[in-house]
Each structure stands twice: as C-alpha cells, then as structure tokens.
C-alpha cells in the first residue's frame, strides 16, 4: 500500500515535523501524493506554480484549487515568469523553486512527488552531461535548496504503482501536453529510451537508484574526509578561500576543495572546463596579479593568497560626509553603517560589527568619511605621506573593494581604513 510506504518515510525522516508544503502541479504524481498526505492529517498547504507556458495553464490552476478545496487543504497560486536563456526546462525549474522559497515558512518542509522513474531520468541526464559522483547521486529523499528543505517520500515508488493507485481510487488529474514532446531531453528519455530499456531489463530503475545511492555515499565520504581541511582554508562568512598551499595538492584535491567551497557559498557548480580555468588562472597566477572570472551570477576573484566569491559590485559616486560624535551614518549601496560613539567608531556590515578605538586626542572630534582617496595620504600621527595604494595593501583590502571601503579622516589625515 502506498499509504503505508508514505507513513514509513515520514516516520523515518520527519518523526516530529508537522508543517509541510506540497508542490502541486495537478499531474497524476502530485495528485496521488496530495490525497495520501490528506490522510496523514498533517499541517499541509499546497502551492501551484503557474508558469504561463501553456494555453491551459489557467485551467490547471483552477483544477488544483478545486481539488484542494474539496480536501480542505489551503491552496496557494504563484505566477512566475520563466527565463528561457538557459532553456525552458531549467528556467521553469529555477522560477518554480524561487517562487516556493518566497512563500515557504521557516517551520515548513517542501514535499514533492518525485518517484523512482524520475530518479532514473535524473541519473541518465547527469550521465549525459558527464557529471561526477555528485551529479550521479541524482536526487535524495531529503535535499536542500537555498533556504528550505525538500522531502521526496515517493522516491522508491515506481510510476506504474502511482498510476495503479490513481486508477483504483478513481482520481482525476491533468495531462500536460508538453510531456509528449520528445524534443525535451527528459521527455525523450521517458518516451523513447526507457520503455525499450525496461523491456530488456525489468528492474533497471531499481538498479539505477542503487547506483545513485552508491554515488551519494561516496560523495558524503569525500566531504567528510575533506571537512577539516576545508574548515582550515575557508572563511564562509567572507566567502573567502586561502589557496596558498593549493599548488602542493593534487589536481583532484584542488578541484574537490574548490567545488565544496563554492557549493557552501551558494554558487552554481562550475563545469569541468570552468574548474580547470579557475585553477590555472587563479591558483597558479603570480601573487601580484588579481585575476577574476565570471561564474553565473557571481565573480570569482583572487587577491594575494585568497580566492573571493562576490556578486556584481557597483562603484558608488564620490562620497564624502562628516561624522560627528554620537551620530550614525548609513553608507550607500549596502556598504554598511558607521557610528561615532565619541571614543570609538563602530562599523557594521552584513551582521558583522567592528569597533575601532580612537586616539585620546580625537575623542568626540568631528571626523570625515570617504569611500576613495587618490594619490598620497598622511596617516594620522605619522610624519610621512604614503601612496594610498600602499595603505590598502598593508590593510589587505582587495582591489575591487577599494572604492567600497570606508575611510575615516581627521582633516586631511587618515585615521582608519574600515576593513
């Protein structure tokens, strides 16, 4: 019985969790899961993502709403715009999860109706892309996407079992006409390839699932073995990786440490070619070079012996403001906030707080805040003027942050670089 299978999965993975959100497309898989979940008497909400890709999309949304109303399950409709630049399938998936991330609550878990046949397709698509063990792990019963947890309780259940249950219970569901279009890779596998494979090897999907599980276990072991070293070299709060020792490591170890660091920083995984480019242009670059590479929505930059992962950084317009005692100053473009406490300066940015003690003669003195300074500068209480570039280097301020780092002046003398 599917209900028994579902109850076993919930008891195993979420024995005390009560709040769930179901991703409801209206297709046979999610309709079956909706009815099963309704019997478990959970605190359940259902969300339907309206992609706007089909002329029938409005009808599908209305159907899902009616089914939820009949089962007395709260229903949410989210409309999204699909970015097709990476393909419709990838764009729709990204838009779907982004929308769910906006509505799901911190105490809720997303439930999806992925099943055994979906797992086989995902594994074969990863194989086609030349993925390593991380990609070949395919889907796990419990996964994560940015800020929420995903639970796939039907991952060991075949499509045939789901169809049989739906027919026995006389459920109704929608049929997405695009599922028959073998132009899409997943549909090609589902419609053209797997029926032939399953005729030859009856338990093919179960064997693929076993291989995916082996890959997942190997990936977990790899991460466990590298965890201490990653902790030694990575600063995740600053999205920074110390690569000074990396030339001594094997290429495989370099690749895995960089992949794990990028993943934990929330970056999209680079391809093998991109990863080799990162290694060649950053790890083996001269120490005085500052290479930078675009990686999806991020920039990967090197400064001295560190890699940094940053977003797109704007250079603010010329900024110069007074800062008086007992005054706060909000800096532009999310650069942070300064407070003059009289005897010290507090600099807050991204939850991090630094306190800079003022020299006694500057207690309660009026100061000035800039975000850039050209040419030479005189450090407070020092006789000689130095190039500002040298002061940045001494303070280890990366090149791309030098117009986003607050400079505290007393008259024309530099008191602090807030970094």
UniProtKB/Swiss-Prot annotation:
Any GO BP: tRNA modification
Binding of ATP, residues: 25-30
Keyword terms: ATP-binding, Cytoplasm, Ligase, Nucleotide-binding, tRNA processing
GO cellular component term, pick one: cytoplasm
Major location category of this protein: cytoplasm
Record has Signal as a keyword: no
Disulfide linkage: none
Reaction equation(s) it catalyzes: cytidine(34) in tRNA(Ile2) + L-lysine + ATP = lysidine(34) in tRNA(Ile2) + AMP + diphosphate + H(+)
Single GO molecular function: tRNA(Ile)-lysidine synthase activity
Entry's EC annotation: 6.3.4.19
Location in the cell: Cytoplasm
Class of enzymatic activity (EC top level): ligase
Xref: NCBIfam families: lysidine_TilS_C (TIGR02433), lysidine_TilS_N (TIGR02432)
Functional description taken from the UniProt entry: Ligates lysine onto the cytidine present at position 34 of the AUA codon-specific tRNA(Ile) that contains the anticodon CAU, in an ATP-dependent manner. Cytidine is converted to lysidine, thus changing the amino acid specificity of the tRNA from methionine to isoleucine.
Comment block on domains: The N-terminal region contains the highly conserved SGGXDS motif, predicted to be a P-loop motif involved in ATP binding.
Family: Belongs to the tRNA(Ile)-lysidine synthase family.
Protein name per UniProt: tRNA(Ile)-lysidine synthase
Gene field: tilS
